Amino acid sequence: MALRMLALFLMLSFSLFAGEIAGRVVRIADGDTITILDVANSQHRIRLYGIDAPESHQAFGQKSKQHLSSLVFGRDVRVKYKSRDKYGRILGTVFADGKDVNLEMLKVGLAWHYKRYDSTPAYAQAESAAHAARLGLWQDKSPIEPESFRKAKRQRRAASAN
């Protein structure tokens, strides 16, 4: 009996971390994080997989958020996902009207391809094309990747605490 319960638990847990969900976008946190409401009125926080958008207080952070909002806010989307991040957000590819929203953010230069975690060729190509055309954040001569921006912010906080 205990073995059956364990097997059922593992199957249900796995299904939570692999698959597809659909819902209406009800919140845009920033340029790579949204919240959707599914048909059961459950909220799901989604981190767009494979991209890293500028932080809210970083150059192009608000433009990135606004563009993502123009693509998905109030619309029905599908999310294909494999896992969750350390904050419990679903890591997924968001589709609106059949378009890969993650890819669209890269095409207009309002996110970096998060190569550390993703190797999608189309994402790398979109980032390169936006960079070459100096679109979005690529207008800056030396844009700072969000990961570096966050690290510098943590270091400043630690230094001021000492």
PLM feature spans:
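Small beta-barrel nucleic-acid-binding modules, primarily SNase/OB-fold domains
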Residues: 2-4, 10-162
